[in-house]
C-alpha cells in the first residue's frame, strides 16, 4: 500500500509535565518531550519493499550490545547504533537521505499531532479500577460484595463466559495513541517539544510524536 500523505515524526523521551502561561494569561498544562539525536537509518521504496516509508533511529546504545545484523544495518546507513527504531509511512520518503538528522524543527507551534507510547503499568487490578464498575452498596446486606464484579454469565445457558467480558486482570502497560494534541511551543536549542495536555507513559518513557492522522 502506497502512502498518500506526508507524515513527519520523531522519537523522544517524556521528561514530565509542567505548566506555562499563554498569550491570554491562561495557565496551560504541558508535557515536555525531548527529541534529540533522531536520524534516518533506512529508506523504504515501492520497487524493493512494496511500500514507501522512512525508518528513524533514536537513543544511543553501547555498540557491544548490538547484534551483528543490526550493527551492519546501522553501518550501512553511516550512523552509530541506536536503541530504538520506528518506521513512518510517508509519501515524501524519497526526499530524505540515509544518515540525515532530524530535529524538533519538523514541528511548529499550534500544529496538531498524535503521540504514541506505552501506558503506565498498574499491575493486577479489580473491575472497579480497571473498568469503572460502581461496586455494591457499602452496607444493608452487601456482605463482602462491595468490590465484586457480579454475574459474568448464565449457568446452563450459555454455560460459558462470553469473550470480551469485563473482568479483573492486568491493567496498563499497553500501546496507546493519544490523538489530536497540540504543540504549544518548540525549543530548537534544547530539542524540546511542549505538548498541551498529557501523553501516554511515565517519565523517561520513549514516545513517538507524529503528524495527526485525523482532524486538522
Swiss-Prot record:
One of its GO terms (molecular function) is rRNA binding. Part of the 50S ribosomal subunit. Forms a cluster with proteins L14 and L19. The keyword RNA-binding applies. Keywords: Ribonucleoprotein, Ribosomal protein, RNA-binding, rRNA-binding. It comes from Arthrobacter sp. (strain FB24). InterPro entries: Ribosomal_uL3, Ribosomal_uL3_bac/org-type, Ribosomal_uL3_CS, Transl_B-barrel_sf. It comes from the Bacteria. One of the primary rRNA binding proteins, it binds directly near the 3'-end of the 23S rRNA, where it nucleates assembly of the 50S subunit. Transmembrane segments: none annotated. It holds the Pfam family Ribosomal_L3. GO terms for cellular component: cytosolic large ribosomal subunit. The keyword Ribonucleoprotein applies. This is Large ribosomal subunit protein uL3. Belongs to the universal ribosomal protein uL3 family. One of its GO terms (biological process) is translation. Residues 137-158 are annotated as: Disordered.
Amino acid at each position: 500500500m502506497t502512502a498518500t500523505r506526508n507524515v513527519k515524526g520523531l522519537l523522544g523521551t517524556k521528561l514530565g509535565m509542567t505548566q506555562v502561561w499563554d498569550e491570554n494569561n491562561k495557565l496551560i498544562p504541558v508535557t515536555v518531550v525531548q527529541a534529540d539525536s533522531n536520524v534516518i537509518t533506512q529508506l523504504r521504496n515501492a520497487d524493493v519493499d512494496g511500500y514507501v516509508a522512512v525508518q528513524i533511529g533514536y537513543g544511543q546504545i553501547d555498540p557491544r550490545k548490538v547484534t551483528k545484523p543490526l550493527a551492519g544495518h546501522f553501518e550501512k546507513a553511516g550512523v552509530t547504533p541506536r536503541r530504538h527504531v520506528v518506521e513512518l509511512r510517508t509519501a515524501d520518503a524519497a526526499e530524505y537521505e540515509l544518515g540525515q538528522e532530524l530535529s524538533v524543527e519538523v514541528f511548529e507551534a499550534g500544529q496538531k499531532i498524535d503521540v504514541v507510547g506505552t501506558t503506565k503499568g498498574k499491575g493486577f487490578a479489580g473491575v472497579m479500577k480497571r473498568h469503572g464498575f460502581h461496586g455494591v452498596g457499602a452496607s444493608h446486606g452487601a456482605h463482602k460484595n462491595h468490590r465484586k464484579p457480579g454475574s459474568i454469565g448464565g449457568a446452563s445457558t450459555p454455560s460459558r463466559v462470553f469473550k470480551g467480558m469485563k473482568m479483573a486482570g492486568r491493567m496498563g502497560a499497553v500501546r496507546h495513541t493519544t490523538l489530536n494534541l497540540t504543540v504549544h511551543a518548540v525549543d530548537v536549542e534544547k530539542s524540546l517539544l511542549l505538548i498541551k495536555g498529557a501523553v501516554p507513559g511515565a517519565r523517561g518513557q520513549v514516545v513517538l510524536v507524529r503528524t495527526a492522522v485525523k482532524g486538522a
